[in-house]
């Protein structure tokens, strides 16, 4: 590991201060890199006023959105520990995990809070709404002292020296994250993740899958999962990509429209999503008898499969360079469509822009 991933984020924020970093697709919320820096600075001030120390736990339970990643960045760079919780967990499980993790603060979305508000959460010093960073609850002693912090005018500007980490370097072997998964037995389990682990994965991504600043990503995977957190946030943001977050369930119609609008360079997903797109866009074509025969005819098979592959790439916006797909085995037919086994010279000669 050469650098902590926050080092790369610092460089991106400095170099792309006025450029868009995060967007809630189809909604009005978006952040420039400079606005991310300003909001992180507000959060750090808030944490100090709440008496939150380095190593204290702060839980996040919400849908994917730009505010989620801003809050996460603030927590990690403050040297507190982020506790990421899936919004689909049952309210009683969420309450138990918040207590189990010894979290002192909760940042929660309205969908989650609708049921969670009926649970006892006595250990929390503050509960904040993910939608607008307003307070839902403050423990006695803090009321009247901190409500103004998240709306204060920022003194940071493009020419101001800024670093996400303000108080010395981070111990890379210290705890950064507790990630609660659904668990193979149906009972959520916590995985403890260090700063070193996150940074190694980010650096591997930057090395293996190079990104040009300003390239776009559509995020459809849950940010509370490690796959989505790394592929749809930490790695592309560290490289200067602009990330569009789907705030609704990624149905084929929503996803296809987002892909056509955004034209991402990278798609991180699970096999089921690609198979649904394949079924929606290509099954009507491939169900024709003549194509069924051609599919297994050596002389024309590669031509047909290349056409199908290009159609799939076009369905994902036409600019996709990388598919990251994990979590389960992919349908072999779909996989063969995506794998391009032609030589580099053949690809240059035969392919046209989608």
Labelled PLM ranges:
Residues 18, 129, 147-180, 187, ...:
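Conserved pre-ATP/AMP-binding loop-to-beta segment of ANL
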Residues 57, 63-83, 87-91, 99-105, ...:
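A short helix-loop-beta submotif of the ANL/AMP-binding
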């Amino acid at each position: 590991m050469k650098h902590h991933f926050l080092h790369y984020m610092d460089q991106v924020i400095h170099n792309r201060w006025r450029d868009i970093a995060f967007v809630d697709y189809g909604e009005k919320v978006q952040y420039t890199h400079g606005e991310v820096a300003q909001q992180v600075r507000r959060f750090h001030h808030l944490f100090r006023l709440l008496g939150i120390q380095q190593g204290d736990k702060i839980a996040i339970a919400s849908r994917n959105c730009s505010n989620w990643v801003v809050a996460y960045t603030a927590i990690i760079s403050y040297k507190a520990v982020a506790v990421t919780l899936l919004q689909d967990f049952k309210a009683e499980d969420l309450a138990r995990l918040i207590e189990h993790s010894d979290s002192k603060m909760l940042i929660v979305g309205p969908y989650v809070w609708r049921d969670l508000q009926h649970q006892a959460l006595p250990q929390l010093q503050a509960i904040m709404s993910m939608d607008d960073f307003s307070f839902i609850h403050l423990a006695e002693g803090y009321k009247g002292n901190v409500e103004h912090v998240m709306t204060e005018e920022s003194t940071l500007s493009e020419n101001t020296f800024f670093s996400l980490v303000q108080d010395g370097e981070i111990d890379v072997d210290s705890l950064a994250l507790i990630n609660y998964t659904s668990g193979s037995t149906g009972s959520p389990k916590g995985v403890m993740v260090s700063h070193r682990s996150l940074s190694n994965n980010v650096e591997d991504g930057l090395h293996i899958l190079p990104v040009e600043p300003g390239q776009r990503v559509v995020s459809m995977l849950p940010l509370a999962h490690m796959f989505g957190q790394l592929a749809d946030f930490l790695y592309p943001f560290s490289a200067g990509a602009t990330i569009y977050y789907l705030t609704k369930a990624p149905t084929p119609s929503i996803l296809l429209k987002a892909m056509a609008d955004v034209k991402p360079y990278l798609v991180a997903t699970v096999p089921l999503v690609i198979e649904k797109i394949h079924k929606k866009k290509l099954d009507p074509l491939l169900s024709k008898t003549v194509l069924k025969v051609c599919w297994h005819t050596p002389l024309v098979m590669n031509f047909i499969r290349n056409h199908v592959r290009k159609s799939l790439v076009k369905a994902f916006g036409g600019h996709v360079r990388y598919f990251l797909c994990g979590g389960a085995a992919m349908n072999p037919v779909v996989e063969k469509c995506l794998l391009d086994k032609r030589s580099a010279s053949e690809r240059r000669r035969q392919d046209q822009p989608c």
